[in-house]
Amino acid sequence: MEHYLSLFIKSVFIENMALSFFLGMCTFLAVSKKVSTAFGLGVAVIFVLGLSVPANQLVYSLLKDGAIVEGVDLTFLKFITFIGVIAALVQILEMFLDKFVPALYNALGIYLPLITVNCAIFGAVSFMAQREYGFGESVVYGFGAGLGWMLAIVALAGITEKMKYSDAPKGLKGLGITFIAAGLMAMAFMSFSGIQL
């Protein structure tokens, strides 16, 4: 149990997808203008990561040498299968949001289908394969990585909303000041890097 708790804390704070590895920055910067939209996208990322990392762990275990047929190693197919599983989960999420939460579906716009190619999603799945997590570890890691990404985007959206009322220099208005805020947040998250769990 202690191992899973440390893996969860590590994936949320120490190895934050957005602020430590700088993965998923396209949607991270583009959708961080309003807290409500950022929260909705964060929940979507938690859903996709929480399901795609364990699902891909199961698929990856079937691709390993001798898993299906003795002497057959299908690990060269891992990237294409990872992308297929992620794309299927994003399509399910997109249909669900379109049917039951149309306001969020419209607010996210093009960024919802872009979760399919969000490098934070693929990065978490790749880290799972590289670190050879078991099924339980992949569930904890996927949920923790999604929660960490959501924490970062909601915090940045809150800062961005407050900066609307600030007197930023003309050349830094918009994405410029957002990059600076994200950089300062990343520096703050670097303080967690010294923690060994």
Swiss-Prot record:
InterPro entries: NqrDE/RnfAE, NqrDE/RnfAE_oxidrdctase, NqrE. It is an enzyme of class 7 (translocase). It is found in: Cell inner membrane. GO terms for molecular function: oxidoreductase activity, acting on NAD(P)H, quinone or similar compound as acceptor. It is a multi-pass membrane protein. The chain crosses the membrane at residues 11-31, 35-55, 76-96, 108-128, 139-159, 175-195. Keywords: Cell inner membrane, Cell membrane, Ion transport, Membrane, NAD, Sodium, Sodium transport, Translocase, Transmembrane, Transmembrane helix, Transport, Ubiquinone. The keyword DNA damage does not apply. Its main location: membrane. Belongs to the NqrDE/RnfAE family. NQR complex catalyzes the reduction of ubiquinone-1 to ubiquinol by two successive reactions, coupled with the transport of Na(+) ions from the cytoplasm to the periplasm. NqrA to NqrE are probably involved in the second step, the conversion of ubisemiquinone to ubiquinol. This is Na(+)-translocating NADH-quinone reductase subunit E.
